[in-house]
């Protein structure tokens, strides 16, 4: 047990400080604090289901990337998303089981992860710092994941945002991703 002659004052001060901070956070809007957006900027951009989006990845040595993909190491690339360019974006192959199975099946179309702030501090896509592109190589319909995410959101269960993207690498078609 803590024994200090001023412990009551210290604990009382900590409680008052906690109550003051709680009050500030509860009534922050009245004091001019802005709440976090319920719909971040990227939700209406890339995750708009009204169309298939385009993502062009500009990579210096794509063959070397594919060869080293199982290592899951980031390389720099330029990502052009719906015509908007983002420089020095981190790119790596994504997955654990899917990465292993892609290798096992002899495929080269990996799921990908983009990290906008990997090389540039504060880099983001309309507030989003990471983006996963799912190759859906085990789903020929490309619908299972999309349907599950939308059903979860419809039922009020937190679910990732998703939409379809046509991905090209250095201008060459690479396929449809989710």
Q: Where are these predicted regions, by residue range?
A:
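Phosphate/dinucleotide-binding and metal-coordinating scaffold of catalytic cores
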Residues: 1-178
């Amino acid at each position: 047990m803590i024994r200090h002659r001023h412990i009551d004052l210290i604990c009382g001060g900590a409680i008052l400080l906690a109550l003051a901070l709680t009050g500030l956070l509860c009534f922050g809007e009245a004091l001019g604090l802005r709440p976090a957006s319920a719909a971040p900027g990227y939700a209406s951009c890339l995750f708009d289901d009204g169309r298939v989006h385009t993502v062009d990845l500009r990579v210096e040595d794509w063959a070397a990337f594919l060869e080293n993909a199982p290592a899951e190491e980031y390389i720099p690339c330029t990502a052009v998303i719906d015509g908007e360019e983002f420089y020095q974006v981190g790119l790596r192959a994504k997955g654990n089981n899917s990465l292993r199975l892609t290798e096992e099946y002899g495929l080269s179309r990996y799921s990908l992860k983009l990290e906008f702030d990997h090389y540039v501090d504060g880099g983001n896509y309309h507030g989003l710092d990471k983006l996963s592109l799912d190759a859906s190589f085990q789903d020929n319909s490309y619908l299972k994941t999309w349907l599950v995410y939308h059903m979860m959101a419809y039922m009020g269960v937190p679910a990732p945002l998703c939409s379809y993207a046509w991905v090209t690498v250095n201008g060459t078609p690479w396929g449809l991703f989710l």
